[in-house]
A protein has these predicted regions:
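Conserved active-site alpha-helix within GNAT-family acetyltransferase domains
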Residues: 152-154, 164-184
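Conserved beta-strand-loop-alpha-helix junction that forms the acyl-donor binding cleft
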Residues: 146, 159-170, 213-215
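Conserved acyl-donor/pantetheine-binding loop and adjacent beta-alpha core of acyl/acetyltransferases
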Residues: 89-126
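Short hydrophobic/aromatic beta-strand element in the GNAT-like acyltransferase core
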Residues: 77-81, 91-93, 126, 192, ...
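Conserved acetyl-CoA-binding loop-helix of GNAT-fold acetyltransferases
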Residues: 126-129, 135-150, 175
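Conserved GNAT acetyl-CoA-binding A-motif
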Residues: 150-164, 190-191
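Short amphipathic alpha-helix that is part of the acyltransferase structural core
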Residues: 12-67, 73-84, 88-89, 206-214
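Intrinsically disordered, low-complexity, positively biased terminal segments
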Residues: 1-25, 174, 180-251
Length: 251
């Protein structure tokens, strides 16, 4: 039986907290987070465009269309927003595909999951924070909150992608429990880690199998992933960013 996420996602979802940094300076500004309605489309796009203008190199952040954002207000997903006062300062999109006709990211197929899992699939497919409010942990919180919503509606299979050159993104995804299980190309020329978690639980990792690899060593990472290893943690060694991989233990 498929799930009607439009009914089951709790529209009264709220989170509150305190922002402690603005433009790198200490502040104390309350924030609240809630689900957005389609009237916020222009503000969400504005934050997205601001993020695109500030990426250090092209391709680290995907350029998403107005139709993409609109679909995840009124179609197969929801968008969380974070407000400081009445100003939207961050958003995170939770994609909830209804089935194989979903028009956007098809992570179920990338992961090799069976078609019967479409109605158990949740996708973390867009997040951005206004530059002056970075440093408050909002990116990670938006990951955590979207996982909460996925759990509520029994969307156990959670997936996301992140550019290897965007460690801020993939480190947050690893921190909330996703694991690197593959690599893929977006639009033919944008390399991405493919991350996944099953919220019902997954195998522990074998500590005897741990391998640490430079993030830039993509061929070696591909070899490990093909051999069944999962990327699970970042490590800084000799001022070089690396990833730790390990094999999952048998169930």
């Amino acid at each position: 039986m498929s799930l009607d996420h439009r009914i089951e996602v709790p529209t009264n979802f709220r989170r509150i907290g305190l922002l402690t940094r603005r433009d790198g300076q200490p502040v104390q500004v309350p924030f609240f987070a809630r689900l957005l309605e389609s009237a916020a489309l222009a503000e969400v796009q504005d934050i997205h465009q601001e993020a695109l203008r500030r990426v250090p190199e092209p391709g680290l952040v995907r350029v998403d269309s107005e139709a993409f954002f609109a679909h995840h207000f009124n179609g197969e997903g929801h968008t969380l927003g974070v407000f400081a006062g009445d100003r939207l300062i961050a958003y995170g999109i939770l994609g909830l595909p209804a089935g194989p006709d979903y028009r956007y990211d098809r992570f179920l197929e990338d992961l090799g999951l069976p078609a019967s899992e479409w109605n158990r699939m949740a996708q973390l497919i867009g997040v951005a924070v206004r530059p002056e409010w970075r440093g408050n942990g909002l990116h990670r919180r938006l990951c955590e909150w979207r996982l909460e919503l996925a759990h509520v509606v029994h969307r156990w299979q959670v997936a996301a992608v992140s550019a290897p050159g965007n460690p801020y993104s993939w480190r947050n995804l690893l921190a909330v429990g996703l694991r690197i299980k593959g690599v893929k190309w977006l639009s033919g020329d944008q390399l991405r880690y493919l991350l996944h978690a099953d919220l019902r639980g997954s195998s522990s990792l074998d500590p005897a199998s741990v391998v640490t690899i430079e993030v830039s060593a993509m061929a070696e990472q591909r070899r490990l992933l093909a051999a069944g290893y999962w990327g699970y943690a970042a490590a800084m060694e000799q001022n070089v960013l690396r990833l730790r991989y390990a094999r999952p233990l048998p169930p």
